[in-house]
Amino acid sequence: MKVLRVNLDEKSYDIVIQKDLKDYFGEYIKTVFDGKKVAIITDDNLNDIYGEAIKKNIENEGFEVEVISVTPGEKSKSFSVLPGIYNKLLDFKLTRSDLIIALGGGVVGDLAGFVASTFLRGISFIQIPTSLLAQVDSSVGGKVAVDLERGKNLVGSFYHPELVLIDPNMLGTLPEKYFNDGLGEVIKYGCIKSKELFEKLEGFENKEDLKENIGEIIYECCNIKREVVENDEKDLGERMILNFGHTLGHAIEQIYNYETYSHGEAVAIGMNMISKIAEEKDLTKKGTAERIESLLKKYGLNTDVNIEDNGLAREAIKLDKKNLNGNLNVILLKDIGEGYIYNTTVEFFE
């Protein structure tokens, strides 16, 4: 078992990483929550696989448990889904002394966290991430949000969980497409902060070799994010480097209506494209983009896309949350493991 402590001024919490942790979720929940009711927010796929077993595991610790399930996919992370969830919480008579659990990938984590931050002006919640992307990235750091038609994560807040429980074995039920999706974020961490992690990923013979070491990979990624979040909780400085590849990635997701490319796939394309642009402008060491593209391809990730409507891309980029005071903060690399913030304008991409 590995435990990381996220130390923040107003709230600190543990990230627990252990194989077969799902058999002990109830016990761990009891260490941070002494209320009565627990509402689990999940999606239909995960509910079919884990819902009943995890519900019983938590009930065995004396809690009253209700499971609320939504349709899988990014389109559930929207305002139209919220009233149904809020009403089910009201029917369950959930109070501010109770608990919400986010059981799922990045979409469920963002959605359930947003619900927890807004229902009754705030209810405690726990993250139980089940996808690789959520385990290495979105479950840690307190960002919760829903999407608007005009862009991703445009309405949200910073709302940290009481606890993050990560069972790497739960990745065994993940479709290969979504394992690859998470690898996009894993590679991102190597790019921005850890040359050692990047070289470790280069050194694995294949994806199966990586999977055998997945617990350690998850720990390394969470530790990098922990350090960055502790230094810049509200995303006004260093934390922006976690968005390497995301400016173009979010634009790609939006242009393709969140259907063609998953988040990690879009970020992978964004990392490759931005690195090539930066090399052309002598802002990144020559050869860096080639290494990134090679590693992305090694793990089955797309590296390029044809954006026919540049106007759509431009508008999506303008809505990027790293834009401050009319300027666009783009995340670039000096070299592998050395991310930095580059202040520019949207014309950078033209």
From Swiss-Prot:
GO terms for cellular component: cytoplasm. Keywords: Amino-acid biosynthesis, Aromatic amino acid biosynthesis, Cobalt, Cytoplasm, Lyase, Metal-binding, NAD, Nucleotide-binding, Zinc. One of its GO terms (molecular function) is 3-dehydroquinate synthase activity. Its EC number is 4.2.3.4. Its cofactor is Co(2+); Zn(2+); NAD(+). Zn(2+) binds at residues 185, 246, 263. Binds 1 divalent metal cation per subunit. Can use either Co(2+) or Zn(2+). Belongs to the sugar phosphate cyclases superfamily. Dehydroquinate synthase family. This is 3-dehydroquinate synthase. The gene is aroB.
